[in-house]
Every structure is written in C-alpha cells, then in structure tokens.
C-alpha cells in the first residue's frame, strides 16, 4: 500500500532502528509480547521482513515475531513465528442460510504457526448525521454533509436515523457472529478488528460499532458487546435460526475461556423466552471444570416447538453461574400449517 520495503529507502533503516529503541526502553513490559514491522507493506517486502524476523529471533527471545500483518491474497512470510493474515474470516450467509455451526478450522489447519486474523469485521453501517456537530475543530465531516444532502435531495432526509439504526443492528449481528465463529475455531490464535470505531483516515469507512470519537451510536452498548467478546464467552452451534412448530430446536453449547485460570465446578444454565419475558424452557446444561482455551463442550439444549402456536421471536440465553459470562441468540418459530382465510379471489391485469 504505502512504504516500499527492501529498496534501500530510509524506511528500511527506520523500521530497524525504532524497534531497537523501543525494545531497549520497554522490552520487559508485560504488554510487549509480540512484534511486527508494520501493516501491508509493498516493494521487495517478503525478503526484507524475513530478515527482520530472523534478526529479532536471534537478538531477543523474550517475544514472538512476525513480519507484517497482511491481506488474504498476500504472500506467506516463511520465517514468521506467527501469522497475522486475512482469509480465515467473514460469514458465508450471502450464499447460505444463517447458522452458527461453522468455523474457520479448514482455512488455518494447513498452517504450522499460530494464525491471527487480520482486519476482522469491516461491516458497515449508514452514516450517523448527528455526529456532524461533534466536529468542533479544524476537521469537518464534509463527507457526512454530502451524504445528508443527497438524502434530502431524494426526500428521505427524515429517515436518516432509521437507516442508521437498522443498518447498525445488522452490523452488530454480523460482528457478533463473526467473532463467535472465530472463537469456535480450535487453535485460532486470535483476531484483530480493523477498528472498533469508524475509521476516518482513508475516505469513508463506517466499520465501527462506535463513532469516530469512540462514542456509542445507540444500537449496541458495552454490556451487549461483552456478551460475545470477553475473556469467557458461551457459544452455541445452531444449524439455523428459523423453524416451524413441528420441529425441535437443538443447540450444542460450548465455551471459549481465556481467563486467568480454569473455572472449577462451573454450572451452565439456559433459558428460552419470548420478547415479553415469558419463559418457555429453562434448565441446566451441565456442571464441569472449564479449562483455559476454546472448543470446550458444555452440553446441549433441546426444545420441542409444538407449544408455539403463533409466529414469534424467541431468545435462548446461556449463562455460567458465578461469573460474568452470558450470551444469547434469537430464533424465530412459525406454524407448520397455516389456515388461509376463505373468500372471493379477484384477478386483474
């Protein structure tokens, strides 16, 4: 994209000198455990970053090293101790029905080194025009002003907030399911979002659950985000989210736990409610010790849907008692047989 490495330009020396100075000052800091030279370089970058990694592996074994974080189509870096790469990310819902069964293991199992996802997310939402007034300095949200004017010119100016909230809810759902899909993947070493907030440094990239100022937009809050992005996250493998009432809802329950220590004798419970709080099912999934790591099965949840007589949305919540770990999933149930009102039918052309 930007800096061209390996061509003898000043950037080559700079990217060696700066980590040396940084490591001299901060080498023993607990938060300094991984090092890369940068993001998405160009030029003769693979040989250069290979030398970068070799130098640091030989010089300072306190940390682990990678050349650079790169996109999915970029070359592999053979000397890396871990990879930060796109490719094992995203959802496949454009070509198949939504589900939470799948994971990314087929895309990372061929790699011997730990694999960290690159720029997970990038789900976009409609602009929040109320953000324009927050720009009180030299920078102005001129792009938002253009978008607002286009909407006004098309007689939809009053719908801007509704568009933002609707697209934002979908954005939050996509982030939830992509992060959970990552956490369901065994041996996935981690993930990094492109940004938690909107990115204003390169055109318009409304990829954030927060705005440019790291403030909430109104469609998801911190507590809701922590349900699917925390040290301990209950997970559910569900084959689909739309059912008829002659079916049985089934979910296999797992947990991703990267807390400070294993959870001893953890009791996992579930409840299934409608949007008014009526409980249709509840119980215990299981009680067991939960080790540090992911792909830890906890049990399953089954519910016959014959008692659901009208179309409605239900919500399954999974909670690990004695901890902050809780997560939930919506699903929809419809009658299998529908009686159509009889009457005269008129056709016209």
Where are these regions (language model features)?
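Substrate-binding/catalytic cleft of secreted carbohydrate-active enzymes
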Residues: 1-210
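Carbohydrate-binding surfaces of carbohydrate-active enzymes
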Residues: 138-349
């Amino acid at each position: 994209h930007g800096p061209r490495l390996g061509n003898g330009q000043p950037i080559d020396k700079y990217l060696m000198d700066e980590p040396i100075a940084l490591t001299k000052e901060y080498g023993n800091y607990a938060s300094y455990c991984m090092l890369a030279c940068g993001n998405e370089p160009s030029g003769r970058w693979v040989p250069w970053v290979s030398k970068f990694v070799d130098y640091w592996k030989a010089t300072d074994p306190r940390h682990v090293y990678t050349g650079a974080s790169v996109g999915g189509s970029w070359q592999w870096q053979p000397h890396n101790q871990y990879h930060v790469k796109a490719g094992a990310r995203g959802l496949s819902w454009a070509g198949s029905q939504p589900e939470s069964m799948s994971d990314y293991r087929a895309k990372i199992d061929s790699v011997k080194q730990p694999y960290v996802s690159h720029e997970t997310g990038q789900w976009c939402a409609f602009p929040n025009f109320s953000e324009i007034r927050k720009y009180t300095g030299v920078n102005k949200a001129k792009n938002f002003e253009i978008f607002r004017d286009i909407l006004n010119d098309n007689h939809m100016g009053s719908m801007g907030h509704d568009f933002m909230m609707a697209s934002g809810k979908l954005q939050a759902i996509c982030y939830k399911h992509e992060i959970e899909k990552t956490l369901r993947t065994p041996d996935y070493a981690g993930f990094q979002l492109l940004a938690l907030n909107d990115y204003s440094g390169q055109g318009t990239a409304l990829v954030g659950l927060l705005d440019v100022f790291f403030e909430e937009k109104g469609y998801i809050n911190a507590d809701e985000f922590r349900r699917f992005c925390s040290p301990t996250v209950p997970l559910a493998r569900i084959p689909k989210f739309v059912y008829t009432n002659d079916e049985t809802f089934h979910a296999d329950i797992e947990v991703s736990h990267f807390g400070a220590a294993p959870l001893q004798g953890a009791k996992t419970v579930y409840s299934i409610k409608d949007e008014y709080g009526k409980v249709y099912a509840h119980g215990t999934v299981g009680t067991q010790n939960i080790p540090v790591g992911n792909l830890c099965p906890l049990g399953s949840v089954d519910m016959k849907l014959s008692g659901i007589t009208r179309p409605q949305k239900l919500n399954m919540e999974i909670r690990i008692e004695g901890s902050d770990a809780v997560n939930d999933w919506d699903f929809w149930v419809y009658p299998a047989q529908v009686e159509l009102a009889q009457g005269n039918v008129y056709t016209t052309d």
